Amino acid sequence: MAVPAKKRKMNFSEREVEIIVEELELKKHLLVNHFNAGVPLAAKSAAWHGILRRVNAVATCRRELPEVKKKWSDLKTEVRRKVAQVRAAVEGGEAPGPTEEDGAGGPGTGGGSGAGGPAVAPVLLTPMQQRICNLLGEATIISLPSTAEIHPVALGPTATAAAATVTLTQIPTETTYHTLEEGVVEYCTAEAPPPLPAEAPVEMMAQHADTSVKPQALKSRIALNSAKLIQEQRVTNLHVKEIAQHLEQQNDLLQMIRRSQEVQACAQERQAQAMEGTQAALSVLIQVLRPMIKDFRRYLQSNMPNPATASEPGQVAQNGQPDSIIQ
């Protein structure tokens, strides 16, 4: 019997992806790694099931929880791959290359080769990928290289190097964008190069090209380092918040201990007051009973018989013998 072919489900629509990203932005303190420190697994599972319910509400086919998690993992992998390409290109001092999804670039970044070499298409993130990047806390450095090409050298009538002149056009400066996680704050570093005369020697053009590349690479590295520092500062702020929460819990425990000590002190004070009252009552009772005891003692002394009179000296004997025999 032939095994029926497994029917493949439809790809995730843009609406489903938008719902996944929107829910993860709302529940990032439960599901995103650098926010969910100490969150129990039950809370994470409940959050994922909530996302699954919202996705199934708009999906044309029923989705399972592993599919939603796999889609989120693929989105993160794609965004991190693009960010890694940008970082590698910035650290190498050149613009990032194109990706599979970006294609070969637009008309301004086509593959035609001019005097300055082939232009390279920048890595640009879609708005949805930018939201995912902000959610992951990745610092993005998107470099937009110049699309203008240097015009070929226009030589004069003579072929001598001394008389060679060129016509230079101003090259648009490279702009660096840095997008933060919350609030999407952008930092731009742009500086226009100094204006050049209409006619300049060939050596001046080469010098200007060398000196304009280094500041742009330096600016890109400075922006990347500042992004890393900001991300580390965010992590430090999270740790500081956790420490503050622990300190608040300890303060609450100390207040509870102080309250219990105050209650114990009040109880001891009440016991001391009760003891003082008991002692006062006993002293009053003793003072009341003291004259009664004296009267009772006098009564007993008055009712006791008188002692026998002393015997005569001649009749008193010791050990049963008369006194005359002892003498």
UniProtKB/Swiss-Prot annotation:
Signal peptide interval: none
Subunit structure: Interacts with HARBI1.
Gene: NAIF1
Biased composition (Low complexity): 88-98
The keyword Signal belongs to this UniProt entry's keyword annotation: no
Protein name: Nuclear apoptosis-inducing factor 1
Organism: Bos taurus (Bovine)
Classification via Pfam families: Myb_DNA-bind_5
Region (Disordered): 88-118, 303-327
Subcellular location: Nucleus
